[in-house]
Amino acid sequence: MTTRLLQGKKGLITGIANNMSISWAIAQLAKKHGAELWFTYQSEALEKRVKPLAEEIGCNFISELDVTDQKSISNLFNDIKEKWNSFDFLLHGMAFANKNELKGRYVDTSLENFYNSLHISCYSLLELSRSAETLMHDGGSILTLTYYGAEKVIPNYNIMGVAKAALEASVKYLANDMGENNIRVNAISAGPIKTLASSAISDFSTMLKFHASTAPLKRNITQEDVGGAAVYLFSELSKGVTGEIHYVDCGYNIIGSSKLL
């Protein structure tokens, strides 16, 4: 690789659950482009999956992060300040919903699931961005992951669609708040892709087939497709881009009707 777009940059990567995670694909490509990375994991159970991945690409920093625990967030950023002093980009890659409610009717969403889904999937972006802002001394890039179900009704996506809609609105408001410090905030709206999280969605295989048959490129996206877009949004190539929802969905979002009968 002759051009290393992230050479000399440091980045915090959240949301890795296993080697099928979009966050992992982004991390791999960021590393290839010269970035020094810091991984987080949600729990001890996930540490067993994430630690070998960190070792695989030479990531020397890995920390537990529970975004529902303010102390956990503070500990992470205190460690980053101590080890790095500052850093350049953040990937917000986590989301949550009770899998038992990723089917049936949205109107049956429980209050507990509504609260937890919005807290982990959306409010955590605010908390991480607030902490990251103090350590992005020379500006930076914050990136999150969303999906078309934030804009249009997708069967069984339910509360996650509402959480992603809130996330996308938050991207715009955060971009406005943080722009004065030369911090850019964007989201990638990725097409459906097989991950640990997506496996919880009822009839997900049907969603994949419909997407591939409808999208102009006639295929589903890959983790590498998203990774390439992420590297662009982390790099100086996108220094004039903020507050954007960047589609990586093989063109699916432009289609009004797949076929006329």
Curated annotation (Swiss-Prot):
Q: In which pathway does it act?
A: Lipid metabolism; fatty acid biosynthesis
Which residues make up the binding site for substrate? 97
Task: List the InterPro entries hit by this protein, alphabetically.
Answer: Enoyl-ACP_Rdtase_NADH, NAD(P)-bd_dom_sf, SDR_fam
Gene Ontology annotations of biological process type: fatty acid elongation
Stored SUPFAM superfamilies = NAD(P)-binding Rossmann-fold domains
Recorded catalytic reaction(s): these are:
a 2,3-saturated acyl-[ACP] + NAD(+) = a (2E)-enoyl-[ACP] + NADH + H(+)
What's the top EC group for this one?
Answer: oxidoreductase
Provide the binding site for NAD(+).
15, 21-22, 42, 66-67, 94, 164, 193-197
Q: Which Pfam families match?
A: adh_short_C2
Q: Which UniProt keywords apply?
A: Fatty acid biosynthesis, Fatty acid metabolism, Lipid biosynthesis, Lipid metabolism, NAD, Oxidoreductase
Q: Quote the CDD domains the UniProt record gives.
A: ENR_SDR (cd05372)
The membrane spanning regions, by residue number, are none
Give the residues annotated as active site: 147 (proton acceptor), 157 (proton acceptor)
Query: EC number(s) of the enzyme?
Result: 1.3.1.9
Name the Gene Ontology molecular function terms of this record: enoyl-[acyl-carrier-protein] reductase (NADH) activity; identical protein binding
**What is the role of the protein in this entry?**
Catalyzes the reduction of a carbon-carbon double bond in an enoyl moiety that is covalently linked to an acyl carrier protein (ACP). Involved in the elongation cycle of fatty acid which are used in the lipid metabolism.
What family does the Swiss-Prot or TrEMBL record give for this protein?
Belongs to the short-chain dehydrogenases/reductases (SDR) family. FabI subfamily.
**Quaternary structure per UniProt?**
Homotetramer.
Extract the PANTHER family matched here: ENOYL-[ACYL-CARRIER-PROTEIN] REDUCTASE (PTHR43159), ENOYL-[ACYL-CARRIER-PROTEIN] REDUCTASE [NADH], CHLOROPLASTIC (PTHR43159:SF2)
Q: What is this protein called?
A: Enoyl-[acyl-carrier-protein] reductase [NADH] FabI
The major lineage groups are:
Bacteria, Pseudomonadati, Pseudomonadota, Alphaproteobacteria, Rickettsiales
Q: Which gene encodes it?
A: fabI
